[in-house]
Amino acid sequence: MKVSYHGHSVVKIETNGKVILIDPFLTGNPKTDLKAEDVNVDAILLSHGHGDHVGDTVELAKKNNAVVVAPFELATFLSWQGVNTHPMHIGGSHEFDFGKVKFTQAFHGSSYIDEENKTITYTGMPAGILFTAEEKTLYHAGDTALFSDMKLIGELNNIDVAFLPIGDNFTMGPEDAVLAAKWVQAKTVVPMHYNTFPVIEQDPYQFVEKLQNCTGKVLEAGESITL
């Protein structure tokens, strides 16, 4: 399984001849190396409904006839826009032809904000994502605060790599993320959701230096690891 990072919370997985994107915020993302028009994808996994995570989902899904796996309310909202969706909910898992997906708890919000009409549409509960293929497991925490049940996620799953937000303000900051890394017990931890906007500026190298009992890895946009 090849896993690459593409800025903010965008993660690409290549496995079993399939390409999966998590939270494909490409257009308007100053930290990504990807352009939506150049991306080919078989499946899209969404953690929640905020614009910096849903991103280019509708365009990518329609262009590639890709399935969008998302929390139930968000999946329903996107299906009304003509997207092929597979709704799930926290605690549920499903075996797809590209791998197994399970949604975990996350402490955050989830909504679609229409700035022009000044409306906010509820899109369900936010989630973290466990993805398993080729006997390897990736944990994408989504946007979240630190929460004690991360210990349970670590106890129940043999996590090879975890992507954890460190930006603070909207999610946990570096200090809490260090504790999260300890609790989820991943072999490798990669920071995400930082430096996209001034309010979430952080030094990822300082973060990985503080990690214990795991390998910390800073990935620049386009860099990858192989599990």
Swiss-Prot record:
Signal peptide: none annotated. The keyword Hydrolase applies. GO terms for molecular function: hydrolase activity. Gene3D superfamilies: Ribonuclease Z/Hydroxyacylglutathione hydrolase-like. InterPro entries: Metallo-B-lactamas (IPR001279), RibonucZ/Hydroxyglut_hydro (IPR036866), UPF0173 (IPR022877), UPF0173_UPF0282_UlaG_hydrolase (IPR050114). SUPFAM superfamilies: Metallo-hydrolase/oxidoreductase (SSF56281). Pfam families: Lactamase_B_2. Keywords: Hydrolase. SMART domains: Lactamase_B. Belongs to the UPF0173 family. HAMAP family: UPF0173 (MF_00457). This is UPF0173 metal-dependent hydrolase BCE33L4354.
